[in-house]
């Protein structure tokens, strides 16, 4: 098996790492950065940009630039309606599920995420110099079963075998603790990212990493902090100028970028100026937005969001059956954990300064790479056992609309449990197994993650049939459910994946489309390179003709001019095959002319540097080295 890469698929940014040379290495992307914006831009002619190039064009292309797609993964439209309405791009409701509408083409959240994963895959392949097919992908600890399944589907669409889905705080703890030897520690991982918040309590020592509890909120993160600044700016501008910027997608995209920048700056300074010239116009008169935001104002605006981090921390400590004094270290993960008020909240609750020993943007990917090395049994990683938990209670709906629990929250996974149920009415020959996830007592108050029917039950009085329901949750936190009638032996199984909305056939179709798009992207890049090569060759040839026209043999000049025109025509038509042929033709006639020029007249030898190095021929040997030198390097880059 080749390398298993670790990918932190984040709401705002993503990161990829690999275990190499007995240590995890964070891989820089093609732009030279160690994290990649989780942004996909769709530009003219179906071309796609991912990462920084997509983010750079977002202001001028807001309706076709997708960000924060992670917030829609594995969710129904109703569950993500608030986020959908806040986005400048169009999110529609298709059969109860969110879809991103880009000029009539409807993309699932998994497809958009797969485009980001393809970028991370390519980044790793460029670094390793070999194809990558296997990955460990991280998810928020509080992700539901359907959100985990959707993440796995995104990996499959991107052409990756997802070897393991790992909780982000667990990955961070693994990265933090892997070099701590046999030291026994209890740590809290406080992970406040771009779109989600997790808190996990772990104990490790002797190579065993055990998650004691986890809690969180999948709708709390840096995006929400951005939104309070955006609302403050938009409301202020409306009050001052009477113009509603929320109706203008381009203006909202500018506000989004300005809010994010201001939030980041306020982590290191006490005030920042937000200056957005020409944000709007009225009666042909341009309007500018200039505001100063202090850290105190920002903390007041974000007070409720900051306080919302506290209850999950309290619940996690309670579920772990510990007190805050039992915690040896608090690890901060996620870009939003840099907010000073958040750090103050963590310090006050846990009674200790949080550790600054890890990079909050990279530590999750590093942990995922270590998990990949563990699965791959690579040398240098040591004997490590990782015991994670399921974040939410799993159960089924029973008579009266009650949720009956089978697997409690914070149960170590993998885990399997069976319970026996019976029928509710006489002569009932079928039962519906409705699978739920959540902590509320009634079925309707929890998240439905799938259902199936068990038919062919032997008719009998109510309460007589014995239906054995088995929940089997794997190491990825993904659930398999089966129901069996003990009398007839009839059995029905389901792998909980329906709530993601994608069938195996749809995943395969999307995977094929992703591969086609990758090939198309490669072809487009090669086309651009070829056009640039032709453009450079045209420019160089024209300059050479201008400077050396009187030295070129008369019988050769028409051939050069004809070949040059052929290349110009091919370049104008953007025909790659024609450009190749024209370049070869131009090289050929230039070499013939060069050979005659070198023969000279009356025994004189022209300078050898007047040749066309790299254009298909070799530099001529010998010749004068006089002062009257004309350089015309003619390169064909392949």
Curated annotation (Swiss-Prot):
Functional summary from the UniProt entry: Acts as a chaperone.
Induction, as annotated: By stress conditions e.g. heat shock.
Entry similarity comment: Belongs to the heat shock protein 70 family.
GTP-binding in keyword set: no
Protein name (record): Chaperone protein DnaK
Entry-linked InterPro entries: ATPase_NBD, Chaperone_DnaK, Heat_shock_70_CS, HSP70_C_sf, HSP70_peptide-bd_sf, Hsp_70_fam
Encoding gene, per UniProt annotation: dnaK
Pfam families with a match to the protein in the record: HSP70
Positions with biased composition (Gly residues): 613-625
Organism listed in the record: Hoylesella loescheii
SUPFAM superfamilies: Actin-like ATPase domain (SSF53067), Heat shock protein 70kD (HSP70), C-terminal subdomain (SSF100934), Heat shock protein 70kD (HSP70), peptide-binding domain (SSF100920)
Residues recorded with modification Phosphothreonine: 196
Domain of life: Bacteria
Stretches the record annotates as Disordered: 597-638
Keywords (A to Z) from UniProt: ATP-binding, Chaperone, Nucleotide-binding, Phosphoprotein, Stress response
